[in-house]
Amino acid sequence: MVEMRKLLGIIDRQGDIVMEQALGEMIAEGEIHRYLKKSLKIYEQRRDDCAALLQQYLGGHIRFQKPSGGLAIWAEWAAPVNLSQVSKICARSDLFIPKTILYQNRNITAMRLGFGDLNETEMEKAIAILAKAVSDLAR
């Protein structure tokens, strides 16, 4: 099978002709452009929803700016917070916060909060759990 793929690669340098034809038609008919416009509106709404929820639940604890692009918000904590502890507390409520989105040193405590794959209900649940974890840690 591996040898056949190698031979096919040598013979057919052009790729998948049917796929190329289909994509060409989609571009010519404006399908890609319509999908892009629709996607941008969805992600802008998710960004706005996330920013509003962060302000509502964590407004006094974090600073952030709505990004003009991308699928995440960089949130800096106003006061130092032990992000490892926050992550552990959130895990008790089934909210997994990977260490790769946490940033902490002597001068800054921040998180990269992604919103691209969450709907408003999921966002609100996650941010509420995060806010409760911060509140519990402050006690």
Region spans (language model):
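PLP-dependent class I/II
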Residues: M1-R139
